[in-house]
Structures are given as C-alpha cells and as structure tokens.
Amino acid sequence: MSSDIPEDEWLDKFADKLATLMYSRGYNQKSLSNATSISRSTISKYLNAEQMPTAKSIVNLSYALNCGANELIDFGHMIY
C-alpha cells in the first residue's frame, strides 16, 4: 500500500531526479530550457524544489531527457 508524503519531500525527490538526469544527459539549465520550451527560471525552481511541475512540463522533460515520466516522478506516493 502506498503512503502519503509531504509536498516538500516530493519536490525534493523530483529535484534530485531531474538534476541527475539533466546532467547525465549533458544538459544545463539553459540547454534544457531550449529543448523543452520551459523557461530557465521555471527549471531553476524545479531544481531548487520551489515549484510543482505541471503535467505538460513532465511530458516535455521526459521527451527531452529520453526517459519515462516514472523516472522523474514517484508514482508510489500521494502528496499532501
């Protein structure tokens, strides 16, 4: 059974996963912004666990990073 986690913990996990994938694929914030049409400031907020990603952003990030959405986000928990 899945457990609930606080939003800030979920955001921290997302930020870590995004940073790992981004740098391992040779992206920096500017190049990822160009590849996804997500503003550089928004990517910075994601990396600093300051903003919840939209579904559209998750799709665009997954496409640019050549990964599944499940590699970016944790589907095993509900967020509170």
Predicted features and spans:
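A short, Lys/Arg-rich alpha-helix, primarily the initiator
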Residues: 1-28
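Residue-level detection of the helix-turn-helix DNA-binding "recognition helix"
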Residues: 23, 37, 48-50, 77
